Amino acid sequence: MNKIRKGDEVIVITGKDKGKRGVVLAVGAEHVTVEGINLVKKHVKPNPMKGTTGGVEAKTMPLHISNVALVDANGKASRVGIKVEDGKKVRFLKTTGAVLSA
């Protein structure tokens, strides 16, 4: 069970974007892509077959999953735990103990 899932609100805890918040767009094995975080400029060639014009565009790149933490109700970074409730595994915030929705 992944501790961070698509749609979770996270805060970056290390790196150049430290302190910024965003919503998780995609989760990989060890990386997460967060909306508006870790933007890089990508130079793109024009391609008439695809109908794209050339230029420089901003692209969101993945972060390592250890560099982000979930945000609790108070706006603070929180670690995530997993416990069994009613025979099912659920995620909960370690700072507040609040159970996260599936």
From Swiss-Prot:
Name the family.
Belongs to the universal ribosomal protein uL24 family.
Q: How does it assemble?
A: Part of the 50S ribosomal subunit.
Instruction: Please state what the protein is called.
Output: Large ribosomal subunit protein uL24
Q: Which UniProt keywords apply?
A: Ribonucleoprotein, Ribosomal protein, RNA-binding, rRNA-binding
Query: What InterPro entries does this protein map onto?
Result: KOW (IPR005824), Rib_uL2_dom2 (IPR014722), Ribosomal_uL24 (IPR003256), Ribosomal_uL24_CS (IPR005825), Ribosomal_uL24_KOW (IPR041988), Translation_prot_SH3-like_sf (IPR008991)
Q: Which GO terms describe its biological process?
A: translation
State its role: One of two assembly initiator proteins, it binds directly to the 5'-end of the 23S rRNA, where it nucleates assembly of the 50S subunit.
What species is given as this protein's source?
A: Burkholderia mallei (strain ATCC 23344)
An annotated Gene Ontology molecular function: structural constituent of ribosome
Q: Name one GO cellular component term.
A: ribosome
Recorded hits in HAMAP family, A to Z, give: Ribosomal_uL24_B (MF_01326_B)
Record Pfam families: KOW, ribosomal_L24
* Protein's UniProt keywords contain Kinase: no
Gene3D superfamilies linked to this entry: 2.30.30.30
Superkingdom as given in the UniProt entry: Bacteria
